[in-house]
Amino acid sequence: MDPLEARQLIPAAPGSDDEGRTSRARLCQAVNLPANGALVMPNGEVITLTAPAAFKPACAPNTTPAIIAGPGGTTGAGVDDAAHVGPQFSDLSDPFYASTFPQCYALAATTVIAYTLVIMLVITPRSFLDGGIVVLGRRGFTSGGSGHGIIGGRPWLQKVAALTVAISLTIATADTFKVAEQQYAFGLQNARELQDKVLNGTELKIIRIISDTFLWLAQAQTLIRLFPRQREKVIIKWTAFALITFDLIFDSLNSFQFPGPGNSRPGSFTDAIPALSYLFQLALGVLYAAWVIYYSLMKKKYAYYHPQMKNICFVAGLSLLSILVPVVFFILDISKPEFTGWGDYVRWVGAAAASVIVWEWVERIEALEREEKRNGILGREVFDGDEMLETDSDATWPQRSRATKGPHGDGDDDDDDGEGGRRIAVGDGTGRRRARRANGSHDSLAADSGRGRNHTQLWTSIASRYRSRPNNGADVSETEKDNTRQTSKNVRPAAARFLQPPLWPARPPPAATPVSRTDTASADSTVYAIRYHPLTDVHSRTTTRPTPPPQLSTERQSAVVDVSGTPTAVEDVRSHDQPSGSQSASPSPPRDQQSPGPPNLVRLSREETRRERRQSLATTSRTGTRVGPDSDDPSASSQQGGESSRGSESTAAKGWRTLAQTLPFRGGTARSAEDSSDSQSTTSKSRSKLQVSREGKSDRWDLRNRMEDFAVTQAERIRERIRPTPDTDSLPVTVIPAPARRGAALAQLLEEDESRQGSGRPRPQDDERPILGSPTLPSSGQRQNSMGPEPLSSNDDLSDSHIPPPAVVRAASRANTSRSTTRDRPPEP
């Protein structure tokens, strides 16, 4: 408050009446005397005012004038007794819209709105329509809100922003009451001084910077949700990050390095930093408003009015009002600076409402759009510019580091091109964890394989984690490995491309004709490791693999076959190797005498599968005494069976008996529940034993893997305790028989024939059994041919041409009936 100027209030000596009228006209003005002022009387007495007072000259009327504080602290209430009667006020005070009353009311209203927004964000999510549930995909900044797929779920950025705004306005309200109380004690009302003292508080400056940051981030996330194209999402994200960073820097400098009453209005800027801070705030607000209005115009069919949701017009009005607040107050700052004494509080809560209400508006628009398009074509919008986000095939197969040594510690880089190296996806945390586990287990298993042990463990671990790698043998000597490595260097690019296709292939070109399932890139370039399961009918749809190098031994090929690690697969390898040694005793076509060319990793063809079924039936009926299903001499067959099953009689009987009991074409015969339970228990026991041995040998020092397995086990136990598995054993069971399959009569005929042969009757010759030489059940020559260098074509599958006609089946049935009748007839004397 400005001090009073020294002037003469009371004349020193009375003069004439003319002089008195002149001085009265000059001094006829009421004067406000502030507190702690001193009045000096003519006799030298000094009077100190303990409270504000008013001096009334002699010309003043009897009525008491009103005391109104002006900008300088003094206000004159001049009264001319000749012209007017009554109190008169000067125009030196602030207008009402710039006084303390509108400021206090605006602050109270914005505080209530801020807390209302917080309550809206924390209430229970709800859905607007039954079929209008919006699913936003995975969590993340560029993928929407909380990611739960329920309308009403809010992102945490909006919650934090609304909460910080409510806290900031609460602090501003408390400071405003303190300053207003001080002014009331002095009898003053200064709105600008009140606002400057409140906004220049240190606590409010800090919380305001934090609140503004979260507000801009929440608005950026809302904009990202509006546009579905990934390119637009990325552009919005990085543009918003840049503008928010600059705004944060300049706002901090403006608050702490350039404090002052003239740094908040455009017309009173004296430095560049306050102007830049105001410019970035205005740019963020205007850009957000422009993009939201553009989105509403694109969705004008649902945005402003819809018959299924008539209150959407109210939400649209609130959204437009909240996003236009920065533009409106920018115009007011330029035109009427005094009017916006309380505009900062409105901008504050308007930014929070612009994010929350617009999010609600967008959810309603998407709900209406999904409800209307629910019966349309299923799928996802694909844009032309999204190819830029696809991963290149070269980037997904990074070369192994030179510091990483090979399985035998030689440290060479032979596997860097993709033939034997480890391959994981770039940027995938799960892939990196799996690769670390695979590295430890692969190194330990390779050390064991160098000593000629754990073939099953080695190939099971590799087949379960990687593609097929034919150069990682189990029982190959060092010389053979060097030769193989030297040979592979000559054909490295083609072999690498053939054996290691990219995990994420590029988008195929649009095809004008239907896609051929046999003429695809996957069938020509992918090598699959197939695990044989007795309950599935495996058909080979892969093309011919190239013949392996001649350095590969028989033990290596047998090790490649063993990919499942079960006793059944081990016995399968032995049964494959056994007939090769007895080919000289049985006649076969010239094609059958050829050496088995490709390894048995991928080849489980149709003839081989049928041969396995037939051999399993023969082994089951004869309890391991017969090896070749098409042997002509029973004595020779028994001799061969004794030689082949001498070392593994018990394992073969158990494995093949289990396989025969679980074959799918034996569904026509009645099987008891005990047999099924026994087979399942045998298989589970063998798998559990193999798993225990594998974990005990390869993962002994893999502490991280063991800790993760322990955590998973404990989590499963806790989940079972919280939500136990429902008891389904007591529920009624209805057995629905399967429909008759094509070839069921043939299978039944074969089973009856095998049962008669197992009961001790002489076995008919192959020329008397036309059915057994059919393509459905291959003979020994066909079985050898299926493993030879001429495999079946990828276009071959089960069709009607491979199934014998009903006439042949009936003829075979009559022939078998006549033979059985002849055999049962007593011999003639």
Curated annotation (Swiss-Prot):
Residues 1-34, 125-159, 255-272, 333-338 are periplasmic. Pfam families: PalH. Keywords: Cell membrane, Membrane, Transmembrane, Transmembrane helix. Residues 502-512 have a biased composition (Pro residues). Residues 776-796 have a biased composition (Polar residues). Residues 56-103, 181-233, 294-311, 360-829 are cytoplasmic. Residues 1-23, 389-522, 537-702, 714-829 are annotated as: Disordered. GO terms for cellular component: plasma membrane. It is a multi-pass membrane protein. InterPro entries: PalH. Residues 634-653 have a biased composition (Low complexity). It is found in: Cell membrane. GO terms for biological process: cellular response to pH. Residues 604-615, 692-702, 716-726 have a biased composition (Basic and acidic residues). The chain crosses the membrane at residues 35-55, 104-124, 160-180, 234-254, 273-293, 312-332, 339-359. Belongs to the palH/RIM21 family. Required for the proteolytic cleavage of the transcription factor RIM101 in response to alkaline ambient pH. This is pH-response regulator protein palH/RIM21. It comes from Pyricularia oryzae (strain 70-15 / ATCC MYA-4617 / FGSC 8958).
